[in-house]
Amino acid sequence: MDFIKRTFPMLFGIFLLSVLVRLPQLNRPLSKHHEFCTAISLRVMQIWYDNGIENYGYNPVMTFNTPADKFINNSANQSGRMIDKQGNYYYVSHPPFAYYFPFFFFKLLHIRPDVLPLQILNMLFHFISGLFVYFTVCLLSFNRARSLPYRSAVVAFAIYMFMPVTLWFQGNVYMSDMAVHLLFIIGVYTALKMIIRRRFYSPKYIFFYCLTLALMIYTSWLGVFFAFGVLVYSLLHVRGELKGFRVLIWSTLIILLVMLRLIVYQYSQINGVSAYVEEMMGRYIIRGSLEETDQGLWHFMFSYLWLVKTLIYNYVMHYIVIYAAIGAFMWLAISRKKLKIVFSENGYRFIWLSVMPVVLLHVFFLNYSVQDFSALYASLFFSVLAGILYDKVKKSGAIPIRTMQVSLVAVLLLMVAQYELMNMPNAFSKQQQKLMGEKIQNSAGADEVIFSSYELLEPQAIFYAHRNVKYAKDKAEAIEFLKATNRTKGVFLELRDNKEYVKVVERFSIDSINQQ
């Protein structure tokens, strides 16, 4: 009852402050800093909502339902083979659960998927993630989460709430990459609690762990690396004093194999197993760690090191304030004898479960990891570490409590300032992609296939246009596409970089061309 009456209101109040910080960024046109992810997610969900998810085999479709939009691949898949007989393209780089939950949640509430509802849901995920950060610190500190507020856990929660990486990617940006983060945090907490509290044989904990792992794998590939991390740790300790790791091993193996089989089966229904395998191999070449191996060893090594540099840069940019705070703690530990850096066995367990899957993801998917949203996954480790270090300093008495409180407020304010600097308005209009999309929509009839020689059309513009746009270098190529797909009318548009410029160059039809 203490948690409901005192702790929860306090934590929710801190969360509301984080929402207040983000208010200027909410419910505006999608425009920047990976908001193309939100545009892709909403395109999938809106097509399902308008036309019925069952008509697409419950798969993430990227083709609008207008007949003129069929057979057009806009940011859908690499190989071009993930297409059904009706001409619908599908996005299969990730499993589909990240789209399912918001879609069915909005469907239940009779809300059409759109920017603000999805942002609100994403911030709710942010709050739930923070709660499990709080629970994790309580678990590691042997404090009951259901009792009075535990100060160090509150610190970890507050740090997590105001990290620039969580403020943005659990607010404005939503896709599988962000949705899996909540499940990852819950998974780490559940596995850690099974080990620390020795709940290996508890049906409740086994069920909750298996459910979390299954949904994690069904959301994004971080779930696979988490499963691998749990397996390796369990195998290393299966013959130790702590019995029960065989339960974790078999539970993890069964869930991993079942979910991978389900994903392959589901996506193979679109256009066969070979098409799906080809698509995933192509995606791995692009997003994995082996791109440009055909260019020679030295070229590959230079490219690899450049990607590592970018990854390090992303971590510095998102966690520089946290690094400074940890650096201050290290200085205190070195300069004052009564403050020692000692981690318990449970601390090392947490480090393994929270860090190993992220490291594996970066190693095997380096090209993917240089997208800075992958730095989100480290927020669990850094926020819990901040809470534990705060607890160590407080117990040592090396710094007065008042000074620690002022320092915490300073850290939070610095992180908010960093968030504002990273996401401040740039030279491009926030309305740009929306205006371009609306002009594209108004420039073509429902029976006209839209063509353009512009190669850099963003997913945001496609989302606001509610139309697919086919790339063609000229009119002749456009006419060839019309004939190949049995369509008769087309319109060629001129689009320009960084402007809301949309101009109708020419309208044409197969019938009029045949008559000439």
Predicted regions and their residues:
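Hydrophobic, aromatic-rich transmembrane alpha-helices
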Residues: 235, 313-345, 356-359, 386, ...
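Interfacial juxtamembrane loops and adjacent helix segments
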Residues: 33, 38-117, 285-294
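Transmembrane alpha-helix segments characteristic
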Residues: 14, 154-160, 208-211, 249-253, ...
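Membrane-lumen/periplasm interface segments of specific transmembrane helices
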Residues: 223, 229, 246-327, 358-361
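Transmembrane alpha-helical segments
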Residues: 19-24, 163, 223, 389-392, ...
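Hydrophobic/aromatic-rich transmembrane helices and adjacent perimembrane loops
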Residues: 170, 177-185, 225, 349-353, ...
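Perimembrane helix-loop-helix junctions
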Residues: 190-198, 209, 213, 225-256, ...
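Short periplasmic/luminal acceptor-recognition loop of GT-C membrane glycosyltransferases, typified by
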Residues: 227-228, 426-430, 442-476, 480, ...
